[in-house]
């Protein structure tokens, strides 16, 4: 951990931002292209097609795939450039113990209450009316998408839904922010607490 990286942390940070931008663009294009080709709809009708109940399974897998491209690939690419073993650099290992499992459960449970409190605080912060209207519109669209994706008719749907719309995207997001961005920021600032704080804010 104390060894000097092959690629400077400042360069890794720039690469990560660049790859993230490219990943977000490619994931959006990939989602639109796959939807248009597989569901036989024009590009302009892709959002409506993804919201239809009969296309919910496709939407789930497409969401997981695009999240993988947008979040996981950039972090993996930077780690691959910076070291020989990308997965080890990202923090993946085969060792796990019961303390880690319990810690994850406790943190996740606590985060539920914290997110609710932060949401309430966010509501009382004064914001421009046009910004609030735009933010609420985006939130409503997101909630509608989540409701569509979360439609589950049986236990198989439940398990598949949890894997595709919850577990997989959460893992890919954590790889980007914790294993990718946080690792680089800690190395860049040479301060673990500061690097973790900055990545948490972002």
Identify the residue ranges that each predicted region occupies.
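Juxtamembrane transmembrane-helix termini
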Residues: 38, 42, 123-126, 186
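Hydrophobic side chains within alpha-helical segments
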Residues: 66, 70, 119-120, 176-177, ...
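N-terminal, membrane-interfacial amphipathic/helix-forming hydrophobic leader that caps
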Residues: 1-101, 109-110, 116
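Juxtamembrane helix-loop-helix connectors linking adjacent transmembrane helices
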Residues: 46-53, 88-168
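Aromatic-enriched alpha-helical transmembrane segments of multi-pass intramembrane proteins
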Residues: 63-73, 146-157, 192-194
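Transmembrane helix-loop junction
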Residues: 79-80, 120, 183, 187
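Transmembrane helix-loop-helix hairpins at the membrane interface
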Residues: 114, 151-202
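Hydrophobic alpha-helical transmembrane segments
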Residues: 13-18, 61, 101-106, 159, ...
């Amino acid at each position: 951990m104390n060894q000097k990286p092959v690629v400077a942390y400042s360069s890794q940070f720039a690469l990560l931002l660049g790859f993230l931008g490219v990943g977000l663009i490619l994931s959006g294009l990939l989602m639109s292209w796959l939807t248009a080709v597989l569901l036989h709809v024009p590009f302009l009708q892709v959002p409506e097609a993804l919201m239809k109940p009969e296309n919910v399974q496709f939407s789930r897998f497409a969401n997981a795939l695009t999240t993988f491209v947008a979040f996981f690939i950039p972090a993996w690419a930077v780690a691959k450039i910076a070291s020989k073993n990308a997965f080890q650099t990202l923090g993946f290992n085969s060792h796990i113990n019961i303390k880690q499992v319990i810690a994850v459960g406790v943190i996740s449970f606590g985060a539920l209450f914290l997110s609710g409190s932060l949401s309430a605080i966010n509501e009382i912060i004064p914001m421009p009316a046009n910004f609030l209207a735009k933010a609420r519109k985006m939130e409503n669209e997101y909630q509608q998408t989540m409701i569509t994706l979360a439609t589950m008719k049986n236990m198989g749907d439940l398990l598949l839904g949890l894997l595709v719309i919850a577990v997989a995207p959460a893992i890919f997001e954590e790889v980007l922010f914790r294993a990718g961005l946080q690792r680089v920021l800690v190395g860049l600032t040479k301060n673990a607490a500061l690097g973790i704080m900055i990545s948490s804010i972002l």
